[in-house]
Amino acid sequence: MQKPWVEKYRPETLPEVVGHHEIIKRLTNYVEKKSMPHLLFSGSPGVGKTTAALALAKDLYGDTWRENFLELNSSDERGIDVIRTKVKDFARTKPIGDAPFKVIFLDESDALTSDAQNALRRTMEKYSDICRFILSCNYPSKIIPPIQSRCAIFRFSPLKTEDLVENLKDISEKETLTLEKGGIDAIIYVSEGDMRKAINVLQTAAAVSDTVTEEIVYKVASKARPDEIKKMTQLALNGKFVEAREQLYNLMIDWGMSGEDILIQVFREVPNLDISEKEKVHLVEAIGECDFRIVEGSNERIQLSALLAKMGILE
């Protein structure tokens, strides 16, 4: 059975990691010196935090990396018992081979409860001689200050377009795919700097056709073309509510888009609209209100229709 491409083409070493050149340079220095502090990786999903941690471990330990590296997903195991058992049991044992210390990687550590984070802080202090921690999170503000102060913080930004394009072209060549310019642009648009999402969309599109086109990408990603969102928005702004709502229903039914997906795309289109700054502010407020109501459980079609109606009377 074929592996997911995100795993098949995951970089094995730090020099292979795409983008984040300054971060990779600092991590490589840690490997060369065989010395590092506790680390905190923050950034949105799919930007390379887990890949960097795994590559660091493989470069640091070589063949014994599995014995000296423990990976836990804190969103699945977020309670204090995990810190008291799995983490502590691994941290208290000496490293295998000539490794100076072990590494524990806590992915999505911002999901840890407050009690679990306090227990983790004590564990980090107690076993600092033989163990280092790498914490990965989407929201560093959810990590308690005592842990943040014990870590060197690395902020992973969304990947640049050129890095995404280079990697997508490389994978397409290895998989003997024809990647059209429109297909690349569409993947860049739907992925928003998320390499994991970009590769997953590419693999899904490749299952449909060996030639990856713009139309296929938007279809498999359940996203609308930016011009379709712009058309719907412009109709609403011009007071053509019925036509705008018809376009909305086409997106939801024909493309299978959720209300949240449509809202996000409308929000991304706001800066490009030919309306005043004041109207853009009011529109963003209306989008935020619509998003809140949908999250609270309101009917998506009704709320999005109400948003389109508000667009026609913006002041």
From Swiss-Prot:
<comment type="function">
    <text>Part of the RFC clamp loader complex which loads the PCNA sliding clamp onto DNA.</text>
</comment>
<dbReference type="InterPro" id="IPR003593">
    <property type="entry name" value="AAA+_ATPase"/>
</dbReference>
<dbReference type="GO" id="GO:0005524">
    <property type="term" value="F:ATP binding"/>
</dbReference>
<keyword id="KW-0235">DNA replication</keyword>
<dbReference type="InterPro" id="IPR013748">
    <property type="entry name" value="Rep_factorC_C"/>
</dbReference>
<comment type="subunit">
    <text>Heteromultimer composed of small subunits (RfcS) and large subunits (RfcL).</text>
</comment>
<dbReference type="GO" id="GO:0003677">
    <property type="term" value="F:DNA binding"/>
</dbReference>
<dbReference type="GO" id="GO:0003689">
    <property type="term" value="F:DNA clamp loader activity"/>
</dbReference>
<dbReference type="Pfam" id="PF21960">
    <property type="entry name" value="RCF1-5-like_lid"/>
</dbReference>
<keyword id="KW-0067">ATP-binding</keyword>
<dbReference type="Pfam" id="PF08542">
    <property type="entry name" value="Rep_fac_C"/>
</dbReference>
<protein>
    <recommendedName>
        <fullName>Replication factor C small subunit</fullName>
    </recommendedName>
</protein>
<dbReference type="InterPro" id="IPR027417">
    <property type="entry name" value="P-loop_NTPase"/>
</dbReference>
<dbReference type="InterPro" id="IPR023748">
    <property type="entry name" value="Rep_factor-C_ssu_arc"/>
</dbReference>
<dbReference type="GO" id="GO:0005663">
    <property type="term" value="C:DNA replication factor C complex"/>
</dbReference>
<dbReference type="GO" id="GO:0006261">
    <property type="term" value="P:DNA-templated DNA replication"/>
</dbReference>
<feature type="binding site">
    <location>
        <begin position="43"/>
        <end position="50"/>
    </location>
    <ligand>
        <name>ATP</name>
    </ligand>
</feature>
<dbReference type="InterPro" id="IPR050238">
    <property type="entry name" value="DNA_Rep/Repair_Clamp_Loader"/>
</dbReference>
<comment type="similarity">
    <text>Belongs to the activator 1 small subunits family. RfcS subfamily.</text>
</comment>
<dbReference type="InterPro" id="IPR003959">
    <property type="entry name" value="ATPase_AAA_core"/>
</dbReference>
<dbReference type="GO" id="GO:0006281">
    <property type="term" value="P:DNA repair"/>
</dbReference>
<dbReference type="Pfam" id="PF00004">
    <property type="entry name" value="AAA"/>
</dbReference>
<dbReference type="InterPro" id="IPR008921">
    <property type="entry name" value="DNA_pol3_clamp-load_cplx_C"/>
</dbReference>
<dbReference type="GO" id="GO:0016887">
    <property type="term" value="F:ATP hydrolysis activity"/>
</dbReference>
<keyword id="KW-0547">Nucleotide-binding</keyword>
<dbReference type="InterPro" id="IPR047854">
    <property type="entry name" value="RFC_lid"/>
</dbReference>
